[in-house]
């Protein structure tokens, strides 16, 4: 029956892509599906690195283009807190592979879905794998084995913890 099981949703209003990053998070009203970055293979062989982002709201059955640029292709994303998305690593641009390749981006970024602000939180002192999966249990997350340079995969698993932010009312308290 077409009323049960899988259902095709509207396509996002951007280019087709591979190596995209996605997660779910609240936009302040609804739980939405977020799609970021990726690459598009053109017919002439050119590979276009994408840094756009979109939010799909299932209640409204519509996509919204996000304001920021997201240089996180093939990286990892996870929801944290009520309205944040944490980005771990990624590929900001394609660089031809060689022994001298610097490796992929180790930047940790934080996106706020209500204010649509993206900040560079910190740079990890070790390689963050791309083209891999992330698993989360509570505030602990694991980044599985993945690629740290073109064609170089690591057997390492990274473990991280999201430390909840202490909310305060202001200077008085």
Residue ranges and their predicted role:
Residues 1-173:
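Kelch-like beta-propeller repeat domains
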């Amino acid at each position: 029956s077409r009323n049960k099981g899988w259902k095709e949703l509207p396509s996002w209003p951007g280019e087709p892509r591979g190596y995209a990053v996605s997660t779910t998070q609240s936009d302040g009203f609804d739980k939405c599906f977020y799609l970021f970055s990726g690459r598009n293979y053109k017919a002439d062989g050119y590979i276009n690195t994408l840094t756009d982002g979109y939010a799909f709201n299932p209640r409204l059955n519509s996509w919204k283009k996000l304001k920021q640029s997201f240089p996180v292709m093939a990286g990892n994303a996870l929801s944290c807190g009520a309205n944040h998305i944490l980005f771990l690593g990624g590929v900001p641009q394609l660089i031809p592979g060689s022994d001298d390749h610097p490796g992929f981006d180790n930047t940790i970024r934080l996106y706020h879905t209500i204010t649509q602000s993206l900040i560079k939180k910190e740079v990890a002192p070790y390689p963050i794998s791309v083209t891999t999966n992330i698993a989360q249990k509570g505030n602990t997350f694991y980044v599985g084995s993945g690629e740290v340079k073109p064609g170089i995969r690591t057997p390492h698993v990274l473990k991280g913890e999201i430390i909840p932010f202490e909310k305060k009312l202001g200077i008085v308290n």
